[in-house]
């Protein structure tokens, strides 16, 4: 059969960042990992998917793909995306409910959607059911350790690049420094620029409540990951005692985790990441659930792919992440009139510049 999976090839790249980027929980980043998976069918057609990490785990993801997932998928019908998604989930469920397993699943699933789009002549935003190919976008800095002057210059760079929304990292050892930095950013950008903050789950519930109350006067759109993402009831306690809406989602890897968050965490925004929640199939499942709860669907990272998904729902915000995967593709993210624009090319709209990234393969 022409759509039978004939071959799957996975590659790992370690791509250096232009400068050290830091947050409150992951520490310093000097590179990110990109794991690509290319699926070839009997008729010779190919689709490429991918996932990424902040610098750790890439070898493990590649190993799970090569030893556990890829051999089991040879001979399967690539058009049966939902069935393959379910198969992968249960094939490796016992050793990985989320985490490395869902990162690996994501790369394969995205490749299958790439094949689907190319076969049907449809871009991802249309395959996802969207009527629109643009969405709101904000720049998310990994800037916790930037001196204040550099932080403010960085924010100015975002605005000069055509964005009207920004997010900064918080979680410094001295909370007053966070408060002062938030105040300085708001004073710099004025009242009309959308402004978010992200603690990378570095605070206790009590600390998060204290900080939120201290900065609510600065018109913060959301407070992201104030505390551990597993502490759904802790999120609810923060929400019950503060005014700034809460956001999370990048550390939720299964539909069950999203379900717990919807039922318990009292979120204002949710941010699934297709690189780690089972690919496009997993992302759409999460997005449908989030939408049922009348919560805007936002994203984390991989803006070159997520622009199509956020545009399809058009309720939330696309994060333009500081890991610039899009700069290693043939079409870096396009921004017009403060909105990100999804590709109209059939497939996922992401084509890697293999010559550019070849030097970083390991």
From Swiss-Prot:
The keyword Metal-binding applies. GO terms for biological process: galactose catabolic process. Could be used for bioconversion of red macroalgal biomass into biofuels or industrial chemicals. The keyword Isomerase applies. The active site is at 169 (proton acceptor), 300 (proton donor/acceptor). It catalyses: 3,6-anhydro-L-galactonate = 2-dehydro-3-deoxy-L-galactonate. Keywords: Carbohydrate metabolism, Isomerase, Magnesium, Metal-binding. Its EC number is 5.5.1.25. Mg(2+) binds at residues 198, 224, 250. SUPFAM superfamilies: Enolase C-terminal domain-like, Enolase N-terminal domain-like. GO terms for molecular function: hydro-lyase activity; isomerase activity; magnesium ion binding. It is an enzyme of class 5 (isomerase). Its cofactor is Mg(2+). Involved in the degradation of 3,6-anhydro-L-galactose, which is the major monomeric sugar of red macroalgae. Catalyzes the isomerization of 3,6-anhydrogalactonate (AHGA) to 2-keto-3-deoxy-galactonate (KDGal). Belongs to the mandelate racemase/muconate lactonizing enzyme family. This is 3,6-anhydro-alpha-L-galactonate cycloisomerase. It comes from Vibrio sp. (strain EJY3).
């Amino acid at each position: 059969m022409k759509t039978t999976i004939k071959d799957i090839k996975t590659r790992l790249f370690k791509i250096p960042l232009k400068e050290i980027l830091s947050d409150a929980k992951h520490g310093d980043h000097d590179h990110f990992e990109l794991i690509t998976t290319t699926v070839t069918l009997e008729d010779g057609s190919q689709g490429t998917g991918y996932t990424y990490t902040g610098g750790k785990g890439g070898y493990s993801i590649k190993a799970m793909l090569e030893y556990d997932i890829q051999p089991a998928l040879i001979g399967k019908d690539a058009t049966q995306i939902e069935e393959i998604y379910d198969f992968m989930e249960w094939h490796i469920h016992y050793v990985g409910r989320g985490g490395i397993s869902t990162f690996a699943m994501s790369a394969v699933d995205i490749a299958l959607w790439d094949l689907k789009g190319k076969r049907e002549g449809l871009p991802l935003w249309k395959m996802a059911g969207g009527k629109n190919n643009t969405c709101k976008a904000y720049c998310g800095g990994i800037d916790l350790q930037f001196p204040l002057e550099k932080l403010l210059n960085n924010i100015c760079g975002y605005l000069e690049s055509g964005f009207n929304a920004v997010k900064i990292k918080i979680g410094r050892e001295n909370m007053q420094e966070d408060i002062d930095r938030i105040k300085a950013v708001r004073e710099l950008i004025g009242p009309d620029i959308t402004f978010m903050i992200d603690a990378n789950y570095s605070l206790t519930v009590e600390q998060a409540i204290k900080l939120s109350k201290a900065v609510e006067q600065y018109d913060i759109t959301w407070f992201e990951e104030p505390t551990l993402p597993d502490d759904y009831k802790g999120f609810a306690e923060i929400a019950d005692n503060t005014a700034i809406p809460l956001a999370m989602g990048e550390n939720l890897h299964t539909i069950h985790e999203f379900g717990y968050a919807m039922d318990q965490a009292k979120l204002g925004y949710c941010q699934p990441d297709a690189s780690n929640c089972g690919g496009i199939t997993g992302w759409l499942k999460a997005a449908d659930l989030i939408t049922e709860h009348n919560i805007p669907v936002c994203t984390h990272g991989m803006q070159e792919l997520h622009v199509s998904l956020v545009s399809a729902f058009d309720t939330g915000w696309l994060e333009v992440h500081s890991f610039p995967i899009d700069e290693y593709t043939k079409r870096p993210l396009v921004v017009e009139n403060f909105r990100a624009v999804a590709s109209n090319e059939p497939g996922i709209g992401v084509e890697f510049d293999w010559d550019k990234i070849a030097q970083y393969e390991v």
